[in-house]
Amino acid sequence: MLESSELAKLVAGRWDATLEMTLRSHPAGGELATYKFAFDLTITDRDRANIYFPASDNITPLVNLNVAYLPVPSPPHVEGGTSLDMCLYDGLGSQIPYLEVTIRDDGKDAPGRAPGMHSVWHHAGGRGDDSRLDYSITLDYGGVPLKMDNNVTQRLLGIDTTQLRLVVLPGMSQPVYCVPAPLKLTVPRVLASSKLAGYYEGRMIIEMVVPSSTP
């Protein structure tokens, strides 16, 4: 019988073990027979599939694009960028062939915006080009940068063979493996005179889909 305290140590993934039993006529006697039992278990934890941000633990991260005003070289311009550490937990011990990831902004109309770009908006609420700062996103998957166009799904192949990261997720006591997927956000250089001075804000929405055909 497996005690509940031992069961609690099993995290999502594939587990295997071998039990060997030897039959003797008495403790000091020779072996009469040997029995071997192979165990192969797949533990799933779909309800805890999670997009995890290690630096923010269990809170929604607040991302600063670090946009700076640069007077030189002339004419003055603004640009910026930042990185966001992210790890994807599939609830299956990363035993699946792929994950699908989609990143989008809050979907406001942005006429004239370059294809694939995401946006933040001036706090005053304007909708013109001068009230919008655009940025691009790339996702590093196994050392390969993948461009994450706005509301376009990227399929991350080879989840079951890629390098994994051991983390303790919020609400869990045992470490699990997740897929490192850090993001790089880049605000390209634009003329400072083309944008309103002040505070810009917006939302970045990240969605992860786990294939339904897995165990």
What is each of the regions a protein language model found here?
Residues 138-196:
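C-terminal structured domain segments
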Residues 2-138, 182-215:
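N-terminal small/polar-rich segments of proteins
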